[in-house]
A protein has these predicted regions:
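NAD(P)-dependent Rossmann-like dehydrogenase/reductase catalytic/cofactor-binding core
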Residues: 2-7, 15, 41, 190-197, ...
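Phosphate-coordination loops involved in phosphoryl transfer and adenosine-cofactor binding
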Residues: 16-19, 97, 125, 315
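Glycine-rich Rossmann-fold phosphate-binding loop(s) that bind the pyrophosphate
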Residues: 25-26
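N-terminal Rossmann-fold NAD(P) dinucleotide-binding loop
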Residues: 29-30
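Aromatic pocket-lining residues of Rossmann-like dinucleotide-binding sites
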Residues: 36
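Conserved beta-strand positions in the Rossmann-like core of class I SAM-dependent methyltransferases
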Residues: 44
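Rossmann-like NAD(P)-binding element
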Residues: 48, 52, 66-128, 135, ...
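Rossmann-fold NAD(P)-binding glycine/threonine-rich loop
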Residues: 113-164, 169-183, 354-408
């Protein structure tokens, strides 16, 4: 299709002289309008509620003034950006726009009606974008005279601060339209990624296991929310644990997204919603906004602490076994901090260490109880994954049912001697961080395998869209594809559920001895 002459020949981005329209004056629409105005565009903002539209414009101008006060903008720049904002009272007023971004209600019928109306008023070269986070771009564009000019332009909230933009192509979207939107998002200071229209796009799909596995562990009495959150923050390196994050998002919103993805994938068990979260929604315990979710947010409420193990004596005899992959850093930390520890080569049962009566290994997706029975190592204690064992201040341990109290105390004492605080969790397959990261990598691998996006764009999306400490594919490479394959295979064997089936991409890389980056 012909793309507006308002875009730059060199970059493909819309020139600052191009007029940008935004439909919807809520938080997201106002944020997108602010981003476009800051980039030099005249921005037309429309909302059915005229008072809300005027209030949003005043709020954006006030935000520009605050940025000037903080030295982030020159006063003249702030005034100029504010002057480029205008309210319009009808969709027909977008006639001269080069790009219109719709950020209205998340309803297919509403979006279709908006775009059908716009087609009657705008130039044939005007690009039509939707900020939807969940509705098929193909479905939104269906029935339009020119569906090839419709694409997703999905910002993350708050739009002025969050770097990521997902540029989403439906079946009819013209490649040059997506390229112009990618270039324009980059010109606006964002980091765009390209995706094809599938349920959840990239971020809302790949992030599902972060919530789902935590809820599964909680449902199996694996640990309290505060303990699971602490493991994911302090060992996993995530900014927020899954339960505090769900409380922040709102359980009504988070549960609805999970349900939507579950239905969209024809009830694939990977995306099965949690009964625990459904009960919170039924009770009205929606998180921060209602004052109660997994945690209480009442005045004076104190956040619960993780269930830390009490201090134990350091074990008398410690032997360390050589490691590769993520456990190599743990071996280094033990070597540096455990005086008198013996270097004992490698171990046939893949042990990390023996400490007093305890035998210690990194979880491989089996329960400690099953692994102890299979290897004949009764006093077995497993340690969970950490993003970087040299820096982590906390780790999770679990024990086999066969493990004696004395042996477990020796293991706890070893980790405490090495400077870790220790959270004890129940013996669930894959523990907490390892199963979560493996399932994130598995979902990411399937997303790439199905042609939704490139590996590089996927990792960038998860780092910039939801602040993951590392993209899940790069993380899988660091852990080792073979280890991730074993963890997933053992989870599948433990549960006997299709939910934990190994992605064909991971299986192929494992068979070939390859990585996502090789």
């Amino acid at each position: 299709m012909a793309v507006s002459s308002a875009h730059s020949v060199n970059s493909g981005a819309l020139a600052p002289s191009a007029v940008v329209g935004v439909i919807g004056a809520g938080a997201m629409g106002a944020g997108i309008a602010q981003v476009a105005a800051a980039a030099g565009h005249t921005v037309l903002l429309y909302d059915l509620n005229e008072a809300a539209c005027d209030k949003a414009l005043a709020g954006i101008r006030a935000q520009f003034a605050r940025l000037a006060e903080r030295g982030r903008l020159e006063p003249a720049q702030a005034d100029a950006a504010g002057s480029r904002l205008r309210a319009v009272r009808a969709l027909a007023d977008f006639a001269g726009a080069a790009l219109i971004v719709e950020a209205a209600a998340e309803r297919l019928d509403v979006k279709r009606e908006i775009f059908a109306t716009l087609e009657r008023h705008v130039d044939d070269a005007c690009l039509l974008a939707t900020n939807t986070s969940s509705i098929s771009i193909t479905s939104i564009a269906a029935g339009l005279r020119a569906p090839q000019r419709v694409a997703g332009l999905h910002f993350f909230n708050p739009a002025p601060l969050m770097a990521l933009v997902e540029v989403v192509s439906g079946l009819a979207t013209a490649p040059e339209v997506a390229q112009v939107l990618v270039a324009t998002a980059a010109a606006w200071g964002k980091q765009p990624v390209m995706a094809k229209s599938t349920p959840g796009f990239i971020v809302n799909r790949v992030a599902r296991p972060y919530y789902a596995e935590a809820l599964r562990v909680l449902n199996e009495q694996g640990g309290a929310p505060a303990s699971i959150d602490a493991v994911m923050r302090e060992a996993g390196g995530f900014r927020m644990g899954p339960f505090e994050l769900m409380d922040l998002i709102g359980h009504d919103v988070n549960f609805a997204v999970t349900e939507s993805v579950f239905r969209a994938y024809f009830n694939d068990p990977r995306y099965t919603p949690s009964l625990i979260q459904q009960e919170l929604v039924n009770a009205g315990f929606l998180g921060r906004k209602s004052g109660r979710g997994f945690y209480s947010y009442a005045d004076g409420a104190t956040p619960p602490a993780p269930d830390l193990e009490a201090p134990r004596d350091a074990p008398a005899d410690v032997a360390l076994f050589a490691q590769d992959g993520p456990a190599a850093a743990l071996h280094t930390r033990f070597t540096e901090r455990i005086a008198g520890a013996r270097q004992a080569g490698t171990h046939a049962d893949d042990l990390l260490a023996t400490a007093g009566r305890a035998s210690i290994a990194l979880t491989d997706g089996r329960t400690a109880t099953a692994r102890a029975a299979q290897t004949g190592v009764a006093d077995l204690v497993l340690v969970d994954l950490a993003r970087d064992y040299t820096q982590a201040g906390l780790v999770a341990l679990t024990r086999a049912l066969q493990c004696s109290d004395a042996a477990y105390a020796d293991a706890v004492g070893l980790f405490q001697q090495a400077g870790f605080r220790v959270v004890g969790v129940a013996d669930v397959p894959g523990m907490v961080a390892m199963r979560t990261v493996a399932m994130l990598a598995n979902e990411a691998a399937d997303t790439v395998n199905q042609g939704v996006c490139s590996p590089a764009d996927l990792d960038l999306a998860m780092e910039k869209g939801v602040n993951y400490p590392c993209g899940p594919l790069a993380w899988a490479d660091a852990i080792g594809i073979g280890r991730v394959f074993r963890v997933l295979s053992n989870l599948a064997a433990s549960y006997g559920e299709d939910r934990y089936r190994v992605s064909p991409r991971i299986a192929a890389l494992h068979a070939a001895g390859r990585t996502f980056r090789s």
